[in-house]
Amino acid sequence: TYAQAGRIVESSTDTVFDDAAAAWWTDTAANKSAMVVVDTASDAADVSTRCQHHLMVDGRLGDHVRDAADGCRIHIGDMVQTRRNTNEVLASDHHRILNRDVWTVTGVTGDGSLKVRHATRHATATLPVSYVSNDVVLAYATTIAGAQGRTVDRGHVVVTPRTTSASLYVGMSRGRESNHAHVVCDSHDHTEF
């Protein structure tokens, strides 16, 4: 079972975001792709910032280049997610920019636009300042909707009283190698999961 395999991790309301970000970092530092799935966009921004901090401490990120739509700071080397389909910008492979595409920030142009490389396609793009300011967020953590269709080596799901069993199922199926549930145990009995 997941419990016997150590894939259900007890946590508290106060520490669950730190715990999930630390687990994400352990995987990332081991050169595994990882993702944290949370209930809300606000939670995703919070956890993504914590994940980003681990990258900064390890020296994996460059200069701050722009602020994201959710208020998070974007640095060279950050993984970001586009949040709106647009025909205004085409990637180098002639595909349009899609909602939930994941990119790595590789540079910034003179006008402040972001140069990005797609996470799974061999494509690059330049995202205009206005698009970044309104439609780009950090991608280390995402909502259940944002996780659908995305697969990583190791998945982490923050389970709170708001998390539905359907959402938990989606979240716990994102990792190829393993999936872990970080369960808040101080405010709700999650025995139904």
Say what each PLM segment does.
Residues 99-193:
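C-terminal accessory regions
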